[in-house]
């Protein structure tokens, strides 16, 4: 969407993030299969898509706000049951999500501080 709107820089960053998310899903699916589980990839949550760039980032930010505590809880559970391989996978994902959270927070704050239009110009 961002590239279609003319925001190449923002589109490239979000594309990188989407590939990162796909890799996270692959790692989790591989681990679940290794543990003789069946991954549930059919359960979909509400998709949050904004109608303009800053709103899109705010939607992504809300997803990270929920994901980070969930990941921390899952890491604690893995430690409790001594599943250190799953814990390490989840820690790696947590690191990535925290970086994305920080980037999103910074971009949203910048759009507010320098003005939405100025920020959007910087994303072209």
Model-flagged regions — what are they?
Residues 1-124:
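Iron-associated oxidoreductase/ferritin-like identity signal
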């Amino acid at each position: 969407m961002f590239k279609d709107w003319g925001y190449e820089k923002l589109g490239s960053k979000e594309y990188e993030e989407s590939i990162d998310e796909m890799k996270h899903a692959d790692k989790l699916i591989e681990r679940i299969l290794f543990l003789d589980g069946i991954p549930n990839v059919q359960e979909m949550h509400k998709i949050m898509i904004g109608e303009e760039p800053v709103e899109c980032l705010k939607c992504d930010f809300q997803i990270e706000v929920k994901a980070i505590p969930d990941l921390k809880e899952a890491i604690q559970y893995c430690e409790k049951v001594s599943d250190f391989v799953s814990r390490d996978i989840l820690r790696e994902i947590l690191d990535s999500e925290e970086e994305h959270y920080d980037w999103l927070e910074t971009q949203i704050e910048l759009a507010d501080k320098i003005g939405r239009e100025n920020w959007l110009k910087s994303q072209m």
